[in-house]
């Protein structure tokens, strides 16, 4: 409802390629046009990408009609850094995980777990790099991070920063609106890192959906696996290490739909993407999605030339 232009442009581009009626775009608020679609009796399949709260309503609407629904919902993904990680790759992955698209990504690496032995150095370097990120207008070549989608979302993010401070977290950098010059009237935020975070804090458990990362210290592989899985969500995540055996153990151990190893936010075509737990149902960007849009049918032909004999004449 707040980003109609891109899909309308896509519709314009494909209108001469696919038959009329195959692809339709309905704009409007989710509470009105979206709810109308949920209530309409003509749909035989529902799909939704968005918040877990709205996703539950979509699932209920599908259940009432006895039709399938695929849901790609919220996340609070774990970005895990072990002491043997490649330093430059790790710093790049930290920023890509939480600053890409201004943090407005369902699989954003918003819980940053850092091994105790490198924690202080990691935090110091991360703060330096976050403070160097160029926040600006999206059409400028030098801009690295643009604005939040609207003022309501910006205010929600800033409220979570305050919640974190009340819980005992420390704002290491950012946490404020960027208002310099031409940014003054926009919804621009400074890249934000929260330190002294524990995994039970609201800022570590609830989806903020913005450029805010919570840094959490851990000692052992077993400890970080337990914390990573102590979440209602399970959409994305990453592990940074030079030890392939550890990488595979952690990747397998985290209950999530996708785990990256030494990268983040790589979403290639052909690789299934979707969530576990409150992060959704079904997988996209892979041929398995076709199973959600089709129904298997069985036609059985009797090849026998005699009756069953169960009911003799």
What spans do the regions from the language model cover?
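Active-site phosphate/pyrophosphate- and oxyanion-stabilizing loops and adjacent acidic/basic residues
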Residues: 12, 35, 56-60, 248, ...
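A structured beta-alpha segment of the ubiquitous adenosine-cofactor-binding alpha/beta core
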Residues: 25-44
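ALDH superfamily catalytic-core signature
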Residues: 17-18, 39, 45, 51-198, ...
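Conserved C-terminal structural/oligomerization subdomain of aldehyde/semialdehyde dehydrogenase
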Residues: 80, 134, 161, 167, ...
């Amino acid at each position: 409802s707040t980003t109609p232009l891109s899909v309308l442009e896509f519709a314009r581009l494909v209108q001469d390629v696919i038959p009329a009626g195959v692809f339709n775009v309905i704009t409007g608020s989710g509470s009105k046009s979206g709810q109308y679609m949920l209530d309409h009796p003509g749909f035989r399949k529902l799909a939704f990408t968005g918040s877990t709260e709205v996703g539950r309503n979509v699932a209920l609407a599908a259940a009432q009609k006895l039709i399938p629904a695929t849901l790609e919902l919220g996340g609070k993904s774990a970005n895990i850094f072990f002491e043997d990680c490649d330093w430059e790759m790790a710093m790049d992955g930290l920023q890509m995980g939480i600053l890409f698209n201004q943090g407005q990504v369902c699989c954003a690496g918003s819980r940053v777990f850092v091994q105790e032995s490198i924690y202080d150095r990691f935090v110091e370097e991360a703060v330096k790099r976050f403070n160097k990120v160029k926040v600006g207008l999206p059409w400028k070549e030098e801009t690295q991070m643009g604005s939040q989608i609207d003022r309501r979302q910006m205010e929600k993010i800033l409220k979570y920063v305050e919640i974190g401070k009340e819980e005992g977290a420390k704002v290491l950098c950012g946490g404020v609106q960027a208002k310099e010059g031409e940014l003054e009237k926009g919804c621009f935020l400074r890249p934000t890192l929260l330190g002294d975070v524990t995994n039970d804090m609201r800022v570590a458990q609830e989806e903020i959906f913005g450029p805010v990362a919570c840094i959490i210290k851990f000692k052992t592989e077993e400890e970080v696996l337990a914390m990573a899985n102590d979440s209602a969500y399970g959409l994305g995540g990453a592990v940074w290490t030079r030890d392939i055996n550890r990488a595979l153990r952690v990747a397998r151990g985290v209950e999530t739909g996708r785990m990256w190893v030494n990268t983040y936010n790589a979403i290639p075509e052909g690789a299934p993407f979707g969530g576990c737990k409150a992060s959704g149902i079904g997988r996209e960007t892979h041929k398995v999605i076709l199973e959600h849009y089709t129904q298997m049918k069985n036609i059985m032909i009797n090849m026998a030339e005699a009756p069953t004999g169960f009911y003799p004449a």
